[in-house]
């Protein structure tokens, strides 16, 4: 009825009110009620501005639950129902989309490795279980590949690299980065799919030298690495899909990915972490970030 009243207000200078009410199937009492409501001062004006600001500052990816937690952190208590209504009125909509997954499986080239993780993505402390995978981005300037490693403890991106080719150097450089940041005496399980990158000598040698434990999904079984693929899905929904990448160079696009992951680790609210980001969660528990 509110939308109808707005349209009728816009047209009543040209057409008679009774005709408009009849055309929009709206009772006169309902119309005058909506007018009175719209003419009242907006008691949520400051909250409306705050919600819009939070939404825009966080890449337009926060739904009403994360907005609720972000407001709570700023000392503002507002019901989720009111937040949902304000977001609808302000047209603050999170865009979602899905694309096909990049696959690097080229057949068996080394002996089969046990699936130690076995879809148990829970970890009691940082660097206990790490998940890794590669995903592909295609923009007008070309293709870029992201290799990332996710910590099951809190979803933190423990390491990542980007490159124009999904080769051994891409994943090995990322693994070197993670190994360099491991706490002393830490030997996590590293779980991957059966992509060729994770069965080449360079990867296996690095794993063995660092005392890391290999775990691999079954062939063609996406749920076995669902937590890592889930991160890629969030990244693409929140950063990639729904935007125009015309005239964006691969270097600039690479920087966009870096900025997103830094924001994801340090700022992005996770509902499963009580409204904290992965870095904030570690600091809250007394772990090194």
Name each model-derived stretch.
Residues 1-19, 23:
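Charged, often Cys/His-bearing segments associated with DNA-binding zinc-finger transcription factors
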Residues 2-5, 21, 28-125, 221, ...:
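Basic, flexible linker segments flanking DNA-binding modules
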Residues 208-212, 236-289:
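C-terminal domain-tail junction helix/linker
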Residues 138, 161-183:
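Active-site beta-loop-alpha junctions of metal-dependent nucleic acid enzymes
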Residues 103-107, 192-194, 200-204, 216-236, ...:
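RNase H-like two-metal-ion nuclease catalytic core shared by retroviral integrases
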Residues 21-24, 31, 51, 67, ...:
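Mobile genetic element proteins and their domesticated derivatives, centered on retroelements
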Residues 119-158, 164-165:
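An active-site-proximal beta-strand-loop segment
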Residues 40, 57, 77, 122, ...:
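Conserved, non-catalytic sequence blocks in retroelement Pol enzymes and Pol-derived host proteins
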């Amino acid at each position: 009825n509110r939308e109808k009243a707005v349209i009728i207000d816009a047209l009543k200078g040209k057409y008679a009110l009774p005709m408009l009410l009849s055309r929009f199937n709206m009772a006169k009492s309902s119309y005058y009620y909506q007018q009175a409501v719209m003419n009242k001062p907006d008691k949520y004006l400051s909250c409306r501005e705050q919600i819009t600001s939070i939404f825009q500052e966080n890449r337009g990816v926060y739904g009403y639950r994360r907005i609720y937690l972000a407001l709570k952190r700023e000392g503002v208590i507002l019901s989720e129902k009111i937040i949902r209504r304000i977001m609808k009125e302000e047209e603050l909509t999170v865009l979602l989309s899905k694309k096909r997954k990049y696959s690097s499986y080229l057949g068996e080239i080394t002996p089969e490795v046990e699936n130690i993780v076995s879809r148990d993505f829970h970890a009691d402390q940082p660097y206990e279980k790490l998940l890794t995978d590669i995903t592909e981005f295609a923009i007008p300037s070309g293709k870029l590949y992201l290799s990332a490693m996710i910590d099951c403890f809190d979803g933190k991106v423990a390491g990542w690299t980007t490159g124009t080719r999904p080769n051994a150097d891409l994943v090995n450089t990322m693994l070197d980065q993670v190994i360099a940041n491991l706490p002393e005496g830490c030997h996590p399980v590293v779980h991957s799919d059966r992509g060729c990158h994770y069965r080449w000598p360079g990867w296996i040698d690095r794993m063995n030298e660092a005392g890391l434990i290999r775990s691999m999904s079954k062939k063609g079984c996406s749920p076995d690495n669902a937590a890592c693929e889930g991160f890629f899905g969030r990244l693409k929904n929140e950063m990639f899909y729904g935007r125009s990448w015309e005239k964006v160079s691969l270097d600039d696009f690479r920087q966009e990915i870096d900025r997103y992951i830094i924001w994801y680790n340090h700022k992005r609210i996770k509902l499963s972490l009580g409204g904290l980001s992965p870095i904030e969660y570690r600091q809250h528990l007394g772990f090194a970030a």
